[in-house]
Amino acid sequence: MESGPAIGIDLGTTYSCVGVFQNGKVEIIANDQGNRTTPSYVAFTDSERLIGDAAKNQVAMNPTNTIFDAKRLIGRRFNDSSIQADMKHWPFRVINKDGKPMLQAEYMGETKTLSPEEVSSMVLTKMKETAEAYLGKKVTSAVITVPAYFNDAQRQATKDAGVIAGINVLRIINEPTRAALAYGLDKKLTGEKHVLIFDLGGGTFDVSLLAIDDGVFEVLTTAGDTHLGGEDFDNRLVNHTSLEFKRKYKKDMRTNPRAIRRLRTAAERAKRTLSSSAQANIEVDSLFEGIDFYTSISRARFEDLCSDLFRKCLEPVERAILDAKIDKKKIDTVVLVGGSTRIPKIQKLLQEFLNGKELNKSINPDEAVAYGAAVQAAILSGDKSDEIKDVLLVDVAPLSLGIETAGGVMSKIIERNTRVPTKASQTFTTYSDNQPGVSIQVFEGERAMTKDNNRLGQFELSGIPPAPRGRPKIEVSFDIDANGIMHVTAKDESSGRSNKITITNDSDRLSKDDIDRMINDAERFKAEDDAQRERINAKNQLEGYAFNLKSAVDDAAAQSKLSPGDKETVTKAVNDVLQWLDSNSLADKEEFTYKLEELQKTCSPIMAKMHAGTGGPRGGGPQGFPSGGAGGPTVEEVD
């Protein structure tokens, strides 16, 4: 297969989307179900692995082995308070392995333990395959988006997920910036404009303020919450309705994962309805212990249940505007991105906060990020199309970066909202006389003390010549590349000795061995998926052939052409096969193929005799000669 263009992937908490820039425009690619967004779900069963729509569609039947929300786990520690809170809502198992959260599922009769990176890589593989099916070409490179407020560990982990999926990750880029790109290119803006991107998705929330001027997109400031989105609103509805169920029926259904999952699906549907109606019904038949549950919820009640979360959405907006040191009135446009921005109350609060500013709803909130990522992928792979040749994106570091100095103080070297790529240096000294070395500990965050910030890594600089405290000069340099990934160097000026660290092999990150193992696992999963597809094909061919034979010998025209003995031979052979299929539906592909050959050996001569008599067509059909393959349903046709 020839190599295709680079693609842009919006890897979302709840849904993902993929786009490609070709023939001078962006195309958002629909999946095999015809949907332009794909659920970020992976499910494991006794016989197969499912990704996307197929996984989400069976979640009520298989809640404990259907994994979603991997983006809420990626790059975090197990004891992170947000993970501990989310675990109360997740039906799947999350375990602690060396301080990292790992996911467990039963697959083909054994327990699989997967990292969040592996689960995300499966979703990325699905998006890559969706693009390949559409383009008819092999896709090797992609730009993958992350929330602007993702920290270093979360960015690195997302990049690892891409590597496991067999993708050459051209760049990890910020979601709101890509949405601004979608808006700017769509509107063909002229003159300098200040644009606020308000991006509220299924699990994360970002605000970015940009200055857009003739194809130059400069991020001024960014703010957000990597743990706020539509899922949190669903949780409020689920809690509210499960308590109502308990009040009405004196039964607690919250211990039953399947009941909670079915209630969550109904709650999510109700939430969407409330964006356009004043009231929504939640109906679930036989929800728990045979009880049919029915309730209705008004938009006002929903807004009350989520009021604190909705108000929380304004804090990053305020922070982004304050950091940019511009007046609210100077904002020309507010662009809404992410499915949760469809909620009327959120729109109303945002509009009031910005003194009644009109909100721009002209771009598709579900597709804007993938659209911008596709443009970025084209730019990075050297596409010189007129539409994008003058586009320049200038992004910023979302969090301040620095090192720990005496007393656990955070000494910032790069302030938040500094343009990237960037370099900055500061000179430090020793804390005690004749100190032979220093330990450089790197942190990101806004707090004054390092204990309240996020530690990225550390390294030692040794061999400092003996000298009184305060005399040696140690220059510490930070260098952030275009992926937002950081390299730190420390150099002793008197001896010229230096040491450096690339903040990649952070203790929270996967080692190279882990990544290699996961790549092999991904290939094994794919091989198992392919084998399963071939097995089902072989089963369907056998079943189709048997039923074609059955209808051919039962046909009135055939009665006169077949001797009673021949008819009995065919009927018995067909019934034996159908009985065998009933009790061996999980047999191997080879067994199905063998059974098909046996059946053909027995019945083909008889059917040929019959058709020689009629001079009829030899096509695959009830009257025609039943073929080994085309007669039966194929795997694509059968749901």
Curated annotation (Swiss-Prot):
Q: Which PROSITE patterns match?
A: HSP70_1 (PS00297), HSP70_2 (PS00329), HSP70_3 (PS01036)
Q: Which UniProt keywords apply?
A: ATP-binding, Nucleotide-binding, Stress response
The Gly residues compositionally biased stretches are: 613-632
User: Where are the annotated segments for Disordered?
Assistant: 609-639
Q: Which GO terms describe its molecular function?
A: ATP binding; ATP-dependent protein folding chaperone
Superkingdom, taxonomy of origin:
Eukaryota
- On whether Hydrolase is a keyword of this UniProt record, the answer is no
UniProt entry tagged with the keyword Cytoplasm: no
Give the Pfam families listed for this entry. HSP70 (PF00012)
Q: Which InterPro entries match?
A: ATPase_NBD, Heat_shock_70_CS, HSP70_C_sf, HSP70_peptide-bd_sf, Hsp_70_fam
Family as reported in the entry's similarity comment: Belongs to the heat shock protein 70 family.
- Which PANTHER family does the record associate with it? HEAT SHOCK PROTEIN 70KDA (PTHR19375)
Kindly provide the name given to this protein in its UniProt entry.
Answer: Heat shock 70 kDa protein IV
| Gene encoding the protein | HSP70IV
